C-alpha cells in the first residue's frame, strides 16, 4: 500500500501543468458574492469543502502543493465564510446548489472528485448524492457524522450534554454550527448512502486528548468516531479507511503527506491502480 501511494503521488507531481491563479476570484451566485480559487489543469477536478466557518485562508498553506498536481483544483468559501457574502440559507441543499452554479459557470461540471474536511464531509456526501453523474469519488478528511452527537449521548448523556452546552457558548450561534446541531437532531442527511456506491477514501484521526475536556476527544469518543466513519463504507468494496493516532483533526495541516497521499489513493481507486 505504501509503495502504491508513493508511486501515485510521484505520478501526480510528474510534469505538472500549472494553470489558473492562486489569487481568489469572485463570482456572484444567486445575488451572493462567492470567493473561489481555481488552480492546476487536467481532465479531473478536485473540489474542496472546508470545515465550519472556514474559507479559502485555511487552504492557503497548501496551494503550492495542490498547484503541482496533474489535476485541476477548485476551492471556495461557502456563503458567510472567508470573504463570501453571508446568506440566510446555509443548508446543505442550498449551499450545494450555489456550488453547482459556481462549478457550471467556470466549466468544471464533470469528472469531479470531492474533498470534504470536517463539516465539509456532510456537504460533499450530499452533493454527490444530488449530482451522482458528475462525481467520481469522495475523500472525507476526519468528516463530521450525523449520528455522532446521539452516539456520544448513548455513551454518557450527562458528559455529552455538558460539553454541547459549552461548545454552543463558544460558537455563539455561528450559522453553520447551528446547522450541524440541527443535523445532529435529525440524525440523517439526504445522501442516499452515496459513500457505499462510489470510490471513497476516509481519513480518521484517532489522536487522543486534543482537548482535555471534550467527550469527543476521549478514548470512547474516538472509538465512536472511528466506527461511524467505517459505517459509511461498510458495504463499499472500492474504498479505503486510513486511521491514524499521529494526526489531529486538522489533517491537511497536521500531516501534509497524508493529505496528498489520500488524494492519490482516491484517484488510484477510480483508475484501478
Stretches found by the model and what they are:
Residues 14-16:
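N-terminal signal peptide c-region/cleavage motif recognized by signal peptidases
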Residues 20-33:
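N-terminal cap/lid segment of alpha/beta-hydrolase-fold proteins
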Residues 32-83:
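Conserved HGGG/HGGXW glycine-rich cap/lid loop of the alpha/beta-hydrolase fold
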Residues 75-115:
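Active-site loop/oxyanion-hole signature of alpha/beta-hydrolase fold enzymes
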Residues 109-147:
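Conserved hydrolase catalytic core segment
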Residues 139-177:
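Flexible "cap/lid" loop of the alpha/beta hydrolase fold
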Residues 162-245:
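Conserved serine/cysteine hydrolase catalytic core
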Residues 239-273:
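Catalytic active-site module of serine/aspartate enzymes centered on a nucleophile-bearing elbow/loop
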Amino acid at each position: 500500500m505504501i509503495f502504491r501511494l508513493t508511486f501515485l503521488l510521484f505520478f501526480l507531481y510528474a510534469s505538472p501543468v500549472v494553470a489558473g491563479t492562486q489569487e481568489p476570484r469572485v463570482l456572484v451566485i444567486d445575488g451572493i458574492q462567492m470567493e473561489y480559487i481555481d488552480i492546476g489543469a487536467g481532465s479531473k477536478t478536485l473540489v474542496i469543502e472546508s470545515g465550519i466557518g472556514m474559507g479559502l485562508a485555511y487552504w492557503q498553506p497548501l496551494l503550492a502543493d495542490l498547484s503541482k498536481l496533474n489535476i485541476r483544483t477548485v476551492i471556495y468559501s461557502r456563503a458567510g465564510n472567508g470573504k463570501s457574502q453571508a446568506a440566510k440559507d446555509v443548508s446543505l441543499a442550498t449551499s450545494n446548489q450555489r456550488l453547482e452554479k459556481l462549478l457550471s459557470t467556470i466549466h468544471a461540471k464533470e469528472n469531479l472528485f470531492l474533498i470534504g474536511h470536517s463539516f465539509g464531509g456532510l456537504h460533499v456526501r450530499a452533493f454527490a448524492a444530488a449530482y451522482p453523474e458528475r462525481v467520481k469519488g469522495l475523500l472525507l478528511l476526519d468528516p463530521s457524522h450525523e449520528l455522532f452527537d446521539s452516539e456520544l449521548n448513548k455513551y454518557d448523556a450527562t458528559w455529552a450534554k455538558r460539553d454541547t452546552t459549552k461548545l454552543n457558548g463558544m460558537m455563539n450561534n455561528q450559522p453553520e454550527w447551528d446547522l450541524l446541531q440541527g443535523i445532529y437532531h435529525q440524525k440523517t442527511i439526504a445522501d442516499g448512502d452515496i459513500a457505499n456506491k462510489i470510490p471513497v477514501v476516509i481519513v480518521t484521526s484517532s489522536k487522543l486528548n486534543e482537548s482535555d475536556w471534550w467527550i469527543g476527544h476521549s478514548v470512547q469518543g474516538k472509538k465512536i468516531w472511528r466506527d461511524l466513519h467505517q459505517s459509511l463504507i461498510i458495504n463499499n468494496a472500492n474504498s479505503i479507511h486510513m486511521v491514524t493516532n499521529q494526526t489531529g483533526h486538522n489533517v491537511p495541516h497536521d500531516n501534509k503527506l497524508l493529505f496528498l497521499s489520500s488524494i492519490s489513493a482516491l484517484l488510484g481507486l477510480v483508475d484501478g491502480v
